[in-house]
Amino acid sequence: MVKKSLRQFTLMATATVTLLLGSVPLYAQTADVQQKLAELERQSGGRLGVALINTADNSQILYRADERFAMCSTSKVMAAAAVLKKSESEPNLLNQRVEIKKSDLVNYNPIAEKHVNGTMSLAELSAAALQYSDNVAMNKLIAHVGGPASVTAFARQLGDETFRLDRTEPTLNTAIPGDPRDTTSPRAMAQTLRNLTLGKALGDSQRAQLVTWMKGNTTGAASIQAGLPASWVVGDKTGSGGYGTTNDIAVIWPKDRAPLILVTYFTQPQPKAESRRDVLASAAKIVTDGL
């Protein structure tokens, strides 16, 4: 009797999955994706972390999703969001001007260096950080909200217990293997990115502004976006650092479909390894094929 009931349950479950997904059961699809990601990781010689959330049904694809990875410049999304959150109670905050000094310049300042001895608004700094990955802009955002610990505190307010920002630019990009500083997990970042861009973590206008900034990113064409159909709309934030660390986090709007959230983190064992945006593009293609 028990064996018969168990067999009936198994047949019913398999039939349900087949009806939902066609002729290939869910477990087979998931296993196939996992195998492809594992092979991509093996061929790349690094460590790959992936988290995909399909908001149509809340299904997920996860690969090393709870391991820590250095965020590098993907952390700029959280810093900009912290400023946007503050602006909810200070309506004119984004227009506030911030002085840019020559002593502020660090290793990568494509926008801020044009404003030395002048000022930039917090809105301009946020756009520079998110769309051009300007490191001076990131440091100004961090300073405005009270330092790295305050950005981490903002993440905690969102329910993210994994994110941690410990340093400023450019030292937050060292990405030393095993170093927990300035890290998160793919799963945690995916959920937080969903809350910020599609959920209620920010007010309506602040959320719309964050999405607009991310859609205007100029650094992501060779990363996640390169693995997606050209008709899909992408808003993303890339990051790179030591040990060939190459990252991209994205909100994706497939044509006539519910949005996707995709986080791809990749790092390598060699301190001076080259960035591998192609790995992120391949991972994006693997997890979105068939959607």
UniProtKB/Swiss-Prot annotation:
PANTHER family: BETA-LACTAMASE, BETA-LACTAMASE-TYPE TRANSPEPTIDASE FOLD CONTAINING PROTEIN
Family: Belongs to the class-A beta-lactamase family.
Leftover remarks: The class A beta-lactamase family has a specific amino-acid numbering system, sometimes called Ambler or ABL numbering and often misspelt as Amber. A multiple sequence alignment was used to derive a consensus sequence and then the consensus was numbered taking into account insertions and deletions. This allows use of identical numbers, e.g. for active site residues, despite differences in protein length. UniProt always uses natural numbering of residues, hence there appear to be differences in numbering between this entry and some papers.
GO cellular component: extracellular region
EC number, as in UniProt: 3.5.2.6
GO biological process: beta-lactam antibiotic catabolic process; response to antibiotic
Keywords: Antibiotic resistance, Hydrolase, Secreted, Signal
Enzyme active site: S73 (nucleophile)
Subcellular location: Secreted
Name of the gene this protein is made from: bla
Top enzyme category: hydrolase
Ubl conjugation keyword on record: no
Binding site for a beta-lactam: K76, S133, E169, S240
Organismal lineage: Bacteria, Pseudomonadati, Pseudomonadota, Gammaproteobacteria, Enterobacterales
Subunit structure: Monomer.
Keyword Secreted: yes
Major subcellular site: secreted
Result when mutating P170L: Slightly decreases resistance to ceftazidime in TOP10 strain. Abolishes resistance to cefotaxime and aztreonam in TOP10 strain. No effect on avibactam inhibition
Free-text activity regulation comment from the record: Inhibited by the beta-lactamase-blocking agents clavulanic acid and avibactam, via a covalent binding to Ser-73.
Molecular-function GO term, any one: beta-lactamase activity
Biological role: Extended-spectrum beta-lactamase (ESBL) which confers resistance to penicillins, as well as first, second, third and fourth-generation cephalosporins. Has cefotaxime- and ceftazidime-hydrolyzing activity. Inactive against the carbapenem antibiotics, imipenem, meropenem and ertapenem.
Catalyzed reaction equations: a beta-lactam + H2O = a substituted beta-amino acid
Protein name from the UniProt record: Beta-lactamase CTX-M-15
SUPFAM superfamilies membership: beta-lactamase/transpeptidase-like
Signal peptide start and end residues: 1-28
